[in-house]
Amino acid sequence: MKALTARQQQVYDLVRDHISQTGMPPTRAEIAASLGFRSPNAAEEHLKALARKGVIEIVSGASRGIRLLLEEETEDQGLPLIGRVAAGEPLLAQEHIESHYQVDPELFKPHADFLLRVNGMSMKDIGIMDGDLLAVHKTQNVHNGQVVVARIEDEVTVKRFKQQGNRVELIAENPEFEPIVVDLRQQNFTIEGLAVGVIRNSDWY
């Protein structure tokens, strides 16, 4: 599968979330309204690009004719466990996947797309410990106060999200750690997903 652009990933996430929440794909007009496109035609162009990359199928003649192909390929394998992430590489690159766990994604709300092995104690005060497996819903649509998986330049971190204009604060849940401040005008910053649950590291032994 070819890598998705940031905008294509937003469209894909929106389609998947809409199916998860309503049981049906969004219309082109709904995609355009949600993501601020000027017209449904712009949404259609992004959907065609996703189809060319093999992650969706467009069913002709239906306003909601969108099928997610990527979900069908991966759902039988279980949730991928992401370990240490190499600088500059996509989070879900094959080389980062340590294994798959047979965990029902629907145990989490919204559903989990992958597990991330936690490194460090910066979030210990809300029960996220070193070595735990964090269940993550892959999306870039997050709100202030939510716990997110974020990438700053080439570093991936788990923190509580707060944004005001072009300033983002990533706040630890441990007084020993200072907030990470990101200037969106000067630094590369990406939301990789939303934390939706945690599995104790001892639960697997």
Swiss-Prot record:
<feature type="site" description="Cleavage; by autolysis">
    <location>
        <begin position="87"/>
        <end position="88"/>
    </location>
</feature>
<comment type="function">
    <text>Represses a number of genes involved in the response to DNA damage (SOS response), including recA and lexA. Binds to the 16 bp palindromic sequence 5'-CTGTATATATATACAG-3'. In the presence of single-stranded DNA, RecA interacts with LexA causing an autocatalytic cleavage which disrupts the DNA-binding part of LexA, leading to derepression of the SOS regulon and eventually DNA repair.</text>
</comment>
<comment type="subunit">
    <text>Homodimer.</text>
</comment>
<dbReference type="InterPro" id="IPR036390">
    <property type="entry name" value="WH_DNA-bd_sf"/>
</dbReference>
<keyword id="KW-0678">Repressor</keyword>
<keyword id="KW-0238">DNA-binding</keyword>
<dbReference type="InterPro" id="IPR036286">
    <property type="entry name" value="LexA/Signal_pep-like_sf"/>
</dbReference>
<feature type="DNA-binding region" description="H-T-H motif">
    <location>
        <begin position="28"/>
        <end position="48"/>
    </location>
</feature>
<keyword id="KW-0378">Hydrolase</keyword>
<dbReference type="InterPro" id="IPR006200">
    <property type="entry name" value="LexA"/>
</dbReference>
<keyword id="KW-0234">DNA repair</keyword>
<dbReference type="InterPro" id="IPR006197">
    <property type="entry name" value="Peptidase_S24_LexA"/>
</dbReference>
<dbReference type="GO" id="GO:0003677">
    <property type="term" value="F:DNA binding"/>
</dbReference>
<keyword id="KW-0742">SOS response</keyword>
<dbReference type="Pfam" id="PF00717">
    <property type="entry name" value="Peptidase_S24"/>
</dbReference>
<keyword id="KW-0805">Transcription regulation</keyword>
<dbReference type="GO" id="GO:0004252">
    <property type="term" value="F:serine-type endopeptidase activity"/>
</dbReference>
<dbReference type="GO" id="GO:0006281">
    <property type="term" value="P:DNA repair"/>
</dbReference>
<feature type="active site" description="For autocatalytic cleavage activity">
    <location>
        <position position="122"/>
    </location>
</feature>
<protein>
    <recommendedName>
        <fullName>LexA repressor</fullName>
        <ecNumber>3.4.21.88</ecNumber>
    </recommendedName>
</protein>
<keyword id="KW-0804">Transcription</keyword>
<dbReference type="GO" id="GO:0006508">
    <property type="term" value="P:proteolysis"/>
</dbReference>
<dbReference type="InterPro" id="IPR006199">
    <property type="entry name" value="LexA_DNA-bd_dom"/>
</dbReference>
<dbReference type="Pfam" id="PF01726">
    <property type="entry name" value="LexA_DNA_bind"/>
</dbReference>
<dbReference type="GO" id="GO:0009432">
    <property type="term" value="P:SOS response"/>
</dbReference>
<feature type="active site" description="For autocatalytic cleavage activity">
    <location>
        <position position="159"/>
    </location>
</feature>
<dbReference type="InterPro" id="IPR039418">
    <property type="entry name" value="LexA-like"/>
</dbReference>
<keyword id="KW-0068">Autocatalytic cleavage</keyword>
<dbReference type="GO" id="GO:0045892">
    <property type="term" value="P:negative regulation of DNA-templated transcription"/>
</dbReference>
<keyword id="KW-0227">DNA damage</keyword>
<dbReference type="InterPro" id="IPR050077">
    <property type="entry name" value="LexA_repressor"/>
</dbReference>
<keyword id="KW-0235">DNA replication</keyword>
<dbReference type="InterPro" id="IPR015927">
    <property type="entry name" value="Peptidase_S24_S26A/B/C"/>
</dbReference>
<dbReference type="GO" id="GO:0006260">
    <property type="term" value="P:DNA replication"/>
</dbReference>
<comment type="similarity">
    <text>Belongs to the peptidase S24 family.</text>
</comment>
<dbReference type="InterPro" id="IPR036388">
    <property type="entry name" value="WH-like_DNA-bd_sf"/>
</dbReference>
